[in-house]
Curated annotation (Swiss-Prot):
Protein name as catalogued: Asparagine--tRNA ligase
Pfam families, per the entry: tRNA-synt_2, tRNA_anti-codon
Lineage: Bacteria, Pseudomonadati, Spirochaetota, Spirochaetia, Spirochaetales
Residue numbers spanned by region Disordered: 329-350
Catalytic activity, EC: 6.1.1.22
Superkingdom of origin organism: Bacteria
Length: 523
């Protein structure tokens, strides 16, 4: 296979000084002097840019002609025949895509060790300054969300994309090293795992046609009825809210499995913490109890944070500084590392995000029951926005108070009341709590949640009925308890919540390439 063109990351990591190179990328900025033009070039492979220097006196005779354009497949008029140097450089604007050839030499300027002294410059794609939305000036996060198809070309979102890619790889490495099998669970399902009722329905029914036919039938005096039996699947189908139930089926055959895929919630909530489409990591372990679940979750989080600090140190350092500057000016985008349970957030200091991640990665989590957590909150003397009582679901303010002001580190709360947890969680002997757990971290609150699953057939069936579900819809799930049942446990990690934590970005819409939220499904 023909070798691909080198990335800037490869060139800058192992610089072949004095060697002739050909680079490709997008223009971040251009600066002109009497003797040279300086182009800041990025290809997104790393946080750094490469300075391309075009010496004006020497280059005019050697700039690209139409002959070079013919070497680039599917690029029409990449270089205009007979174009002068001035004309070519005029088309080199912020956002333009270019190819530059020349010698890599030590840079006499500050800020970079190397530069490319160009002898050949080709404009592959123009970005006219009068219409290209992302100019050299800084843009708000809100503005960039409206241009999500272009925002990866900014330094902040390119860094976030690289962190996302690195952490996705770390997820797979963690489980592969521990002999988990990766299982693909369905996106279209007939089962509701969480019971919240916030589901997207999947149908081939055409509402316009249905309305037209219903009107015609009504005008003729005939009732018009349509059921899911007439739909594509012959029954109600939905987008999945979790791959857990199907994951359990494979855990009870392969022992250790995990899923990693998109999930969907039709929750009509426009906040910095909610998405309608997001990714979940969900391991499931046969022959495991709730304590095993806690151990793996704690180890998993530390592994991911260490991987981010090791593999994305430069991006995290950049985000630590840059995201705070943007987020402070936008409501709802306060950097996570600067958040506090106090009414006035503390001043953000350089390196705060990195220090927080390092502290959480090495600190063992304090473990306490839900009942113990409620007592601590009730006796704290703190006036919370959401009042605390036994039986309430812990809110972010409660979780951050425990992690930041009581224990000063990660916390695992377990044994929650059964009324606020899902039907599949195993009942404790007291009959009022279930073997569930949440892993909480400073600056965010809950980052993972899991439980030991109910493995007894009769108890599970009773829990399904008590939760208001039709047992017939879960017949396949209860079969797992009828045939070769085994104790098992698992947990879920919202991948975007992890990314929020690692990048320090205050709005979850900024850690996924194309956010899906109520009334927003662009791109």
């Amino acid at each position: 296979m023909r070798a691909m063109h080198p990335l800037l990351k490869e060139i800058l990591t192992h610089p072949p000084s004095g060697q002739h190179e050909c680079v490709h990328g997008w223009v971040r900025s251009k600066r002109e002097t009497k003797r040279a033009v300086f182009i800041s070039l990025s290809d997104g492979s790393c946080p750094d840019t490469l300075q391309v220097t075009v010496p004006l006196p020497e280059c005019s005779a050697s700039l690209s002609s139409g002959a070079q354009a013919e070497q680039i497949p599917n690029v029409r008029d990449a270089v205009l025949q007979g174009e002068t140097l001035a004309q070519t450089l005029k088309r080199v604007t912020t956002g333009a895509c270019i190819r530059a050839e020349g010698a890599l030499v030590p840079s006499p300027g500050a800020g970079q060790a190397l530069e490319l002294r160009a002898c050949n410059l080709t404009v592959l794609g123009e970005a006219p300054a009068e219409t290209y939305p992302l100019q050299k000036k800084s843009h708000s996060f809100e503005f960039l969300r409206a241009h999500a198809h272009l925002r990866a070309r900014t330094s902040t979102f390119a860094a976030c994309a690289r962190v996302r890619s690195a952490l996705a790889g770390a997820v797979h490495r963690f489980f592969s090293e521990r002999h988990f099998q990766y299982v693909h669970t369905p996106i279209i399902t007939a089962s509701d795992c969480e019971g919240a009722g916030e589901l997207f329905r999947v149908t081939t029914f055409d509402p316009v046609r249905i309305a037209r036919e219903a009107h015609a039938a009504g005008a003729a005096g005939n009732p018009y009825a349509l059921t899911y039996a007439d739909d594509f699947f012959g029954k109600a189908a939905r987008l999945t809210v979790s791959g857990q139930l199907q994951g359990e089926a494979y855990a009870l055959a392969l022992t250790r499995i995990y899923t990693f895929g998109p999930t969907f919630r039709a929750e009509n909530s426009n906040t910095s913490r909610h998405l309608s489409e997001f990714w979940m990591v969900e391991p499931e372990i046969a022959f495991a109890r709730i304590t095993d679940c806690m151990d793996v979750a704690e180890e998993f989080l530390a592994y991911l944070l260490r991987a981010a600090l090791k593999d994305c140190a430069q991006d995290i350092a950049f985000l630590d500084e840059r995201a705070a500057q943007h987020a402070r000016s936008a409501r709802g985008d306060t950097p996570l590392a600067a958040r506090s349970t106090a009414r006035t957030p503390p001043v953000r200091t350089p390196g705060q995000l990195t220090r927080m991640l390092e502290d959480v990665a090495r600190a063992p989590a304090t473990r306490l029951t839900y009942t113990e957590a409620i007592k601590l909150l009730e006796n704290s003397g703190r006036s919370f926005e959401f009042p605390v009582r036994w039986g309430c679901d812990l809110q972010s303010e409660h979780e951050c108070f425990l992690t930041e002001e009581v224990f000063h580190g990660p916390v695992i709360v377990y044994d929650y009341p059964k009324e606020i947890k899902a039907f599949y969680m195993k009942l404790n002997a007291d009959g009022t709590t279930v073997r569930s757990m949440d892993l909480l971290v400073p600056g965010l609150g809950e980052i993972m949640g899991g439980s030991e699953r109910e493995e007894q057939f009769e108890v599970l069936c009773a829990r399904i009925r008590a939760s208001g579900f039709d047992p017939h819809d879960y017949r396949w799930y209860t079969d797992l308890r009828r045939f070769g049942t085994a104790p098992h446990a698992g947990f879920g990690l919202g991948f975007e919540r992890l990314l929020q934590y690692v990048t320090g970005l205050g709005n979850i819409r900024d850690v996924i390439p194309f956010p899906r939220t109520p009334r927003t499904a662009d791109f």
